[in-house]
């Protein structure tokens, strides 16, 4: 396929001819012709790269009903449910734009892969309960003909949350809500905790909650690849590139109290191709912002937050990249194979990794300790000073641990209330959000994808009401408080 692709600032690209076009009684193999011409030019100009003609078969289509910005688990989940819920096969054309198909800096692949239902908000509990069902039946949802079944390597060891005296009442209240929503969670006194987990030091622990079903951890990379494989089989298109611009129309409106607002509708997405100064315009009806830690930049391209401060028009998407470290250590005398993911009163956490006496964990920094998110370099002193002392206090065997490796990843951190943003923007009427989950987006992705697809296709949330997660709460100042974010 040859398509004229335009540098920034020029008009639309044109599709000139499809491969195999019949002409004069024979078939023209255009991809083959391009390859042949490139070889000839290279032979004439040895040692020089050939950019005179570009094979553009990797380009996005000129039109897509839905453009999803971000090809991580959240974006792929939205794509999956859009195709799953469409009225007939092929009714909706979906394009996923991902700037890095290696996912080297994507939050999904750098996650510790945990799933639990021990939240304080009913919506978060419901989302994680559905995700547990989705993961448990993964091959019913994501099976592809003639492809091997998925093995998420789910470890159902549960989550163990520890509370100090001042947080014990809140933990009891949270567990009551969790049980009402159907989660299987038990409360444990310090004595019960010592009996079940003799390796733990209960100093400073007044109460613990323990997830007995559908909690643990899984392979996030396997889920990502399984979703990608499935949506491709359903006809979802992919493009490696970066969204650099939206072309929109505007309409000035008056509210019921006679305040002027400007409604925008995106008509075209400009996708800058990988390692190129060229872009491809894509006409669309809907844009899904699932760009994770960089979703605020995508929102700003659409004009979100451009108005006067204190107005709905001037309300920005409060999501930014926050760097989080994960450390892996070895400790032969450490807790055994049935060790849950432990969340300490200090904020430190850990779990086992495999069968070889290895563990991984970390701790979210305070606001004053937040590292520079410009790169993914690891601060090993943070472990020595801020993580290890808490681990060694809670599990005395960890006094002799030896750090083996470490990595860093990004949270799509919602600075407003650390909860997700789901659904349409009130003024950019065809931009929908699936972002800002501040570390629990992976485990809730199946439910979030379904909710966004419902809103796009049906105009409302149908299975789980996620109205508290709408963008308008930022303008109204209505924080939703989730007490259990690790």
Curated annotation (Swiss-Prot):
One of its GO terms (cellular component) is cytoplasm. GO terms for biological process: mitochondrial respiratory chain complex I assembly. Its cofactor is FAD. The chain crosses the membrane at residues 62-82. The keyword Nucleotide-binding does not apply. It is found in: Mitochondrion inner membrane. Its EC number is 1.-.-.-. It is a single-pass membrane protein. One of its GO terms (molecular function) is oxidoreductase activity. Changing residue 430 to S: In MC1DN19; hypomorphic variant in vitro. Disulfide bonds: none annotated. Its main location: mitochondrion. Signal peptide: none annotated. It is an enzyme of class 1 (oxidoreductase). Keywords: Disease variant, Electron transport, FAD, Flavoprotein, Membrane, Mitochondrion, Mitochondrion inner membrane, Oxidoreductase, Primary mitochondrial disease, Respiratory chain, Transmembrane, Transmembrane helix, Transport. Required for the assembly of the mitochondrial membrane respiratory chain NADH dehydrogenase (Complex I). Involved in mid-late stages of complex I assembly. Associates with components of the mitochondrial respiratory chain complex I. PANTHER family: FAD-DEPENDENT OXIDOREDUCTASE DOMAIN-CONTAINING PROTEIN 1 (PTHR13847:SF287), SARCOSINE DEHYDROGENASE-RELATED (PTHR13847). It is linked to Mitochondrial complex I deficiency, nuclear type 19: A form of mitochondrial complex I deficiency, the most common biochemical signature of mitochondrial disorders, a group of highly heterogeneous conditions characterized by defective oxidative phosphorylation, which collectively affects 1 in 5-10000 live births. Clinical disorders have variable severity, ranging from lethal neonatal disease to adult-onset neurodegenerative disorders. This is FAD-dependent oxidoreductase domain-containing protein 1. The gene is FOXRED1.
């Amino acid at each position: 396929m040859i398509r004229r692709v335009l540098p920034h600032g020029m008009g639309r690209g044109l599709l000139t001819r499809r491969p195999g076009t019949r002409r004069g009684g024979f078939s023209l193999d255009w991809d083959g012709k391009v390859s042949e011409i490139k070889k000839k030019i290279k032979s004439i100009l040895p040692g020089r790269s050939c950019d005179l003609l570009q094979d553009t078969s990797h380009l996005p289509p000129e039109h897509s009903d839905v453009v999803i910005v971000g090809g991580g688990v959240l974006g792929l989940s939205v794509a999956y449910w859009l195709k799953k819920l469409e009225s007939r096969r092929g009714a909706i054309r979906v394009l996923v734009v991902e700037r890095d198909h290696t996912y080297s800096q994507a939050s999904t692949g750098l996650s510790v892969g945990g799933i639990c239902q021990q939240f304080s908000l009913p919506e978060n509990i419901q989302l994680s309960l559905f995700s547990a069902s989705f993961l448990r039946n993964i091959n019913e949802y994501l099976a592809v003909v003639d492809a091997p079944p998925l093995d998420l390597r789910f470890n159902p060891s549960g989550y163990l949350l520890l509370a100090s005296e001042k947080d014990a009442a809140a933990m009891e209240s949270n567990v009551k809500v969790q049980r009402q929503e159907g989660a299987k969670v038990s409360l444990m006194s310090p004595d019960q905790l010592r009996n079940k987990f003799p390796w733990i030091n209960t100093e400073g622990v007044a109460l613990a909650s323990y997830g007995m079903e559908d909690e643990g951890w899984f392979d996030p990379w396997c889920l990502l690849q399984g979703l990608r494989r499935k949506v491709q089989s359903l006809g979802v298109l992919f493009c490696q590139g970066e969204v650099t611009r939206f072309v929109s129309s505007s309409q000035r409106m008056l509210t019921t109290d006679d305040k002027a607002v400007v409604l925008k509708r995106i008509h075209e997405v400009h996708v800058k191709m990988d390692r190129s100064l060229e872009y491809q315009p894509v006409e669309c009806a809907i844009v899904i912002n699932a760009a994770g830690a960089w979703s605020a930049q995508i929102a700003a391209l659409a004009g979100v937050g451009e108005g006067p401060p204190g107005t709905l028009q001037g309300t920005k998407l409060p999501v930014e990249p926050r760097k989080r470290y994960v450390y892996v250590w070895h400790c032969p005398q450490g807790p055994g194979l049935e060790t849950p993911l432990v969340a300490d009163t200090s904020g430190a956490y850990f779990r086992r990794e495999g069968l070889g006496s290895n563990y991984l964990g970390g701790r979210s920094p305070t606001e004053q300790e937040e590292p520079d998110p410009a790169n993914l370099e690891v601060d090993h002193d943070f472990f020595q000073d801020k993580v290890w002392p808490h681990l060694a206090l809670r599990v005395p065997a960890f006094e002799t641990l030896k750090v083996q490796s470490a990595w860093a990843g990004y949270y799509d951190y919602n600075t407003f209330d650390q909860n997700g943003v789901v659904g349409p923007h009130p003024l950019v009427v065809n931009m929908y959000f699936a972002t800002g989950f501040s570390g629990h987006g992976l485990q809730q992705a199946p439910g979030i994808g379904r909710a966004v697809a419902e809103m796009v296709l049906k105009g409302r949330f149908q299975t789980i009401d996620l109205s508290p997660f709408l963008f308008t709460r930022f303008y109204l100042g209505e924080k939703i408080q989730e007490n259990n974010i690790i």
